[in-house]
UniProtKB/Swiss-Prot annotation:
The keyword Repressor does not apply. It comes from Mycolicibacterium paratuberculosis (strain ATCC BAA-968 / K-10) (Mycobacterium paratuberculosis). The modification N6-(pyridoxal phosphate)lysine is found at K227. Keywords: Amino-acid biosynthesis, Cytoplasm, One-carbon metabolism, Pyridoxal phosphate, Transferase. InterPro entries: PyrdxlP-dep_Trfase, PyrdxlP-dep_Trfase_major, PyrdxlP-dep_Trfase_small, Ser_HO-MeTrfase, Ser_HO-MeTrfase-like, Ser_HO-MeTrfase_PLP_BS, SHMT-like_dom. This is Serine hydroxymethyltransferase.
Amino acid sequence: MSAPLADIDPDIAGLLGQELGRQRDTLEMIASENFVPRAVLQAQGSVLTNKYAEGLPGRRYYGGCEYVDVVENIARDRAKALFDADFANVQPHSGAQANAAVLHALMTPGERLLGLDLANGGHLTHGMKLNFSGKLYDVGFYGVDPTTHLIDMDAVRAKALEFRPKVIIAGWSAYPRVLDFAAFASIADEVGAKLWVDMAHFAGLVAAGLHPSPVPHADVVSTTVHKTLGGPRSGLILGKQEYAKSINSAVFPGQQGGPLMHVIAAKAVALKIAGTEEFADRQRRTLSGARILAERLSGADVAAAGVSVVSGGTDVHLVLVDLRNSELDGQAAEDLLHEIGITVNRNAVPNDPRPPMVTSGLRVGTPALATRGFGGAEFSEVADVIATALAGGRGADLAALRDRVTRLARDFPLYEGLEDWALVGR
């Protein structure tokens, strides 16, 4: 029971050490990834992993829950206070399970759901035909304007009036602009639909007051706690009090059994951190870094190579890069940046002619670098590295670019001393 991981399972310990090295020595720019504080790691690796706690605080189906009840209540209270919401359920194991619970609470199978098309930046759980949401519900989609790549609210209204959905989803996985939540709410009211906002990507910006909050406009709001919020990989549901009972029942027993109390403790820690000025500063640097990146990727040298920025810029933490006119496809560009030590993900762009495993775009995000401490100068440097690589393709001096990346990574050490604590047990 007391032997450290390195002694019990050196294979896994070795792989964890290698992954730690990868995170330290490269630049993480996948928009949905971040680095959690050590306090979050400690909470998630705590003895709460041993405790079963089906039900809600004060109404458990197991004994011995006197302490985990307090933990969950703290997490719920912090979530409500941070986002000024009437109620919160902190039990979803993931964003996808939170979304499944929302649909379970608001709809019955076969009813109509309207969301942003996956090909235009929507999420799998917003009605993609191979996902549970596309199999259980009658799904319609709105998209982006083919020229501006912006969501046209008049077109959304027209689609809603034609389709008459039970629920309208406002949210995205790869859309670089702020949504008009008031307009979505007005459309939902007009057609008698419920409005559900999935703010998984931009919740941290909302918490810091840098992005409009959907909470005053939506019936229900779901989010992940990682991404911009910088907490453990998990989900969270907020909303109006009138939906609390149906949401709670949809989570348990509708979607899950026992909650992961060690993860809920980690959520509580992350939500406390999200109310601090240090967190707000991090979000400001996240946002400014994305704008620096978008501006550099709109430069003449990049444009000459056929690379452009979808919608011409960004309002959030990510930039969507269009490679349709470039010699690179999404897979090739992802591999090229990986070779110089920058991790991104290939991503479809609107009207993408290539298959989803290849794509014609990249999704590039700034949260993890802001968490490491990057400011304007560093974001300008990494933006120039990416621009130079994409403009030059395989003809770029990749070794020189890799050296620049390595220097940036080593200037901002990550998880110093973590090996001794997490792997060796000292």
